[in-house]
UniProtKB/Swiss-Prot annotation:
InterPro entries: UDG_fam1, Ura-DNA_Glyclase_AS, Uracil-DNA_glycosylase-like, Uracil-DNA_glycosylase-like_sf. Coiled coil: none annotated. This is Uracil-DNA glycosylase. GO terms for cellular component: cytoplasm. Keywords: Cytoplasm, DNA damage, DNA repair, Hydrolase. Gene3D superfamilies: Uracil-DNA glycosylase-like domain.
């Protein structure tokens, strides 16, 4: 089996685990039935659907989805809305500082995912208007197991850890086989600590060049 096939096998086994099928998924079924939950149910695992795991290069870890209408669609930090959420606005500020000529016509990061960037939130769902409402329901176990699987079954992946919730996973990543880039979270509350000026996007492409992988085209046409 290639990496994509092995990943799908792991993914199906994970969804059969007791915490997932007996706790997390019944909770989500009830939430989607009775409340407004983001992203749409069919988009929960879009971050995995859009990445070819034979070409996985980068894992960027977020927190939980955006809480307003027409924003979250299954990719961490990405949005369908024309108006950019503040964290994404700061991401684009840093990106433009790294690459002044970058073209950013929307906040939809699908083109990044298609180049091998897994945009993974720590928690994959949220109730409308209520940040962190789906923490401690099982998503943390799931995303921990995903990161653990990638760490053990892939090589030379660049893990981008923005903020404490992402950095909590640092101890579970094999330093010898992977690269770790970290800074404060790009939210307005913490971007000035170490996110701005981190040159994260330049660093990602410099590493990819060093390991003979195709660099990321950051343009969003």
């Amino acid at each position: 089996m290639n990496k994509e096939q092995r990943w799908k096998s792991f993914f199906e086994k994970e969804k059969a685990q007791k915490y997932f099928k007996d706790e997390l998924w019944p909770f989500l079924e009830n939430e989607y039935k009775n409340k407004i939950i983001f992203p749409k149910k069919e988009d929960i695992f879009k971050a995995f659907d859009l990445v070819d795991f034979n070409n996985l290069k980068v894992v960027i870890i977020g927190q939980d989805p955006y809480i307003n209408e027409n924003q979250a669609h299954g990719l961490a930090f990405s949005t369908l809305d024309f108006l950019l959420p503040k964290s994404l606005k700061n991401i684009f500020i840093e990106l433009k500082n790294n690459y002044p000529n970058v073209v950013l016509k929307s906040g939809n990061l699908t083109s990044w995912a298609s180049q091998g960037i897994l945009l993974l939130n720590r928690v994959l769902s949220v109730e409308k208007g209520l940040s962190s409402s789906h923490y401690n329901r099982g998503w943390e176990i799931f995303t921990f197991n995903v990161i653990d699987y990638i760490s053990k079954n892939f090589e030379n992946i660049i893990f981008v850890l923005w903020g404490k919730k992402a950095q909590d996973l640092k101890k579970d990543i094999n330093f010898k086989n992977h690269f770790i880039l970290e800074s404060s979270h790009p939210s307005p509350f913490s971007a000035n600590i170490s996110f701005f000026g981190s040159q994260i996007f330049l660093k990602i492409n410099k590493i990819l060049e060093q390991i003979n992988k195709e660099k990321i085209n950051w343009n969003i046409e």
